[in-house]
Swiss-Prot record:
Protein name as it appears in the record: Regenerating islet-derived protein 3-beta
Binding site for Zn(2+): H107, E121
Function in brief: Bactericidal C-type lectin which acts against several intestinal Gram-positive bacteria and Gram-negative bacteria. Lacks antibacterial activity against S.typhimurium. May play a role in protection against infection with S.enteritidis by inhibiting its translocation from the gut lumen into intestinal tissues and further extraintestinal tissues.
Membrane-traversing stretches: none
Species whose genome carries this gene: Rattus norvegicus (Rat)
Gene: Reg3b
């Protein structure tokens, strides 16, 4: 027979085990695991979690951004790392794009008002941790306030361009 002081301790242990059981017990039916592959519309390419589409009909930066926003969570492309930059460069080169520049989602809404080019940002508000300028936009005499991929860099590097120029553009959106 158990000592009478053992009952409260054992009751507490049993209660603790039951509480833990509810936290570690698995679900009866497993949840559907999302597919690693995304489905993109015809004419666009998948990379990571997004679809990318190059549009050859030239637009101003602002009109291109508005056109991209018509797609699900769409904006002009933000280039967040070297791998994405390489993917984009390959995509733009393989389409036979004959323009010197192609719009991306980079712009400076301060129109150079921030020192050392600090006003540049992505149109979709992604954080700008990766930078790949062809030239320093804050020191150029003919500087623009919208970003583009430059043909002379193999479409890997960025160039500040006048926003009113009509250029092809790349949209980034969800599938």
């Amino acid at each position: 027979m158990l000592h009478r002081l053992a009952f409260p301790v054992m009751s507490w242990m049993l209660l603790s085990c039951l509480m833990l059981l509810s936290q570690v017990q698995g679900e009866d039916s497993p949840k559907k695991i999302p597919s690693a592959r995304i489905s993109c519309p015809k004419g666009s390419q998948a990379y990571g979690s997004y679809c990318y589409a190059l549009f050859q009909i030239p637009q101003t930066w602002f009109d291109a951004e508005l056109a991209c926003q018509k797609r699900p969570e769409g904006h002009l492309v933000s280039v967040l790392n070297v791998a994405e930059a390489s993917f984009l460069a390959s995509m733009v080169k393989n389409t036979g794009n004959s323009y010197q520049y192609t719009w991306i989602g980079l712009h400076d809404p301060t129109l150079g008002g921030e020192p050392n080019g600090g006003g540049w940002e992505w149109s979709n508000n992604d954080i700008m941790n990766y930078v790949n300028w062809e030239r320093n936009p804050s020191t150029a005499l003919d500087r623009g306030f919208c970003g583009s991929l430059s043909r002379s860099s193999g479409f890997l590097r960025w160039r500040d361009t006048t926003c009113e120029v009509k250029l092809p553009y790349v949209c980034k959106f969800t599938g």
